[in-house]
Swiss-Prot record:
This is Exodeoxyribonuclease 7 large subunit. Heterooligomer composed of large and small subunits. GO terms for biological process: DNA catabolic process. It catalyses: Exonucleolytic cleavage in either 5'- to 3'- or 3'- to 5'-direction to yield nucleoside 5'-phosphates. Its main location: cytoplasm. The keyword Heme does not apply. Belongs to the XseA family.
């Protein structure tokens, strides 16, 4: 029901609190699931106080119940346990605080947990979070390895010692977190996000040395699975629990059976790599020697041929052939030049004999009128007294027509 309010007609805080309490009262009793993060049982008190938390969304709510309700499950429930409670929501108006009053509390059994994990597994698989094509390859030689593990844990020691034994120069960026219990999910998620944000981190290892199914529940939490799926950095899961692998094993880019196995898969062994380099050098040396031996045999075979016993003989034979060809060329060229010279002399003699200069040398003269016209007959000589130019072999002179 919408409330008709305005800045001029607001509702008092008490009225708002009363209305909220009325809405909550109409909810009735509901079943709620969560993880017990705080448990307070005061001696002599008839009421037990609990805090239920949803680890996937980091939301908590206070729960109260009568001691006789809690005593029925007190031996099997501790902080960190998952329970379902039948409770009536209550609104405490003076403080504006919501709480639950439980009338029944039941621990969540391992069988039920496994069923829920299987359902979550199928749901995430349907989204493609476990697909092989999403897996990122690990670098051959990471310069900086991010490690998420419990403080001073065997898992931390196994990863650090084995990795440094294999490759002493490897460096680690370690984030110590809770690896079980109510705070594990939030701390592991934060650590993974911090390491993924560091550009120099080449690979992230999330390690824990095994444990019960209940202890490993944080590593199947949906929030953590989605965080790992969103990482740009390759992630290695090293939880170390073979029968029932947590969902982290499926979303990680590589699964290691134990923290020690993770160290072996993350960094190469310096001894093995040196041996591999030596093997490659030996193989290259054998290949080069084989090539040299083959070329030496080929050279020896070539030198053993008859032509190579007296190599100058081929040159001498070709030199004689060249000399013969040069002599022949000189003779042919000389003959051609002599014939050309004879033909040129003959042609020159004919040209000279046909030249007007030869006629003039025999005493003849050529008469030309002043306009250059050659006189070929007496009629062309012109009138008496007209000058003519006479050309002879040694020059020319002027004459005049006489009658």
């Amino acid at each position: 029901m919408a409330l008709n309010t305005s800045a001029e007609a607001p509702l008092p805080v008490g009225e708002v609190s009363r209305l909220i309490g009325g809405w909550i009262d109409r909810l009735g009793a509901i079943w709620v699931e969560g993880q017990i993060t705080q448990l307070s049982r005061r001696p002599g008190a008839g009421v037990v106080f609990l805090t239920l938390r949803d680890p996937s969304h980091d939301i908590s709510v206070s729960v109260t119940c009568f001691r006789q309700v809690f005593d029925r499950i007190a031996d099997v429930v501790t902080e960190g346990a998952r329970v379902v409670v039948l409770a009536k929501p209550e609104w405490y108006a003076p403080r504006g605080q919501l709480s639950l009053r439980a009338t029944d509390i039941r621990p969540v059994g391992i069988g039920e947990l496994l069923v829920r994990l299987e359902q979550l597994k199928k749901s995430l698989a349907a989204e493609g979070l476990f697909a092989l094509d999403r897996k990122k390859p690990l670098p051959f030689l990471p310069q900086l390895v991010g490690l998420v593990c419990g403080r001073a844990s065997a898992a931390e020691r196994d990863v650090l010692e084995n990795a440094r034994r294999r490759w002493p120069a490897v460096r680690f960026e370690v984030r110590n977190t809770a690896v079980q219990g109510v705070n594990a999910v939030a701390q592991v998620v934060q650590a993974v996000e911090e390491l993924d944000a560091l550009q120099e981190v080449d690979v992230i290892v999330v390690a824990r040395g095994g444990g019960s199914v209940e202890d490993l529940l944080p590593f199947s939490d949906e929030q953590l699975i989605r965080t790992v799926a969103a990482c740009r950095t390759p992630v290695v899961s090293a939880i170390g629990h073979e029968p029932d692998s947590p969902l982290l094993d499926l979303v990680a880019d590589l699964r290691a059976s134990t923290p020690t196995d993770a160290a072996k898969k993350v960094v190469p062994d310096v001894g093995e790599e040196l041996e591999r380099v030596q093997q490659l050098r030996d193989r290259a040396l054998r290949t080069v020697r084989g090539l040299l031996d083959r070329e030496e045999r080929g050279l020896a075979h070539a030198l053993g041929r008859p032509a190579m016993e007296r190599p100058h003989r081929l040159v001498d034979e070709r030199e004689a052939e060249v000399d013969a060809l040069l002599g022949r060329a000189r003779r042919v060229l000389g003959h051609l030049l002599d014939r050309a010279d004879s033909e040129l002399s003959h042609t020159l003699a004919r040209v000279v004999s046909l030249s007007p200069a030869a006629t003039l040398e025999r005493g003849y003269a050529v008469l030309q009128r002043p306009d250059g016209h050659v006189v070929r007959s007496p009629e062309e000589a012109g009138a008496p007294g007209e000058p003519l130019r006479a050309r002879v072999s040694e020059g020319e002179f002027t004459v005049r027509v006489d009658g």
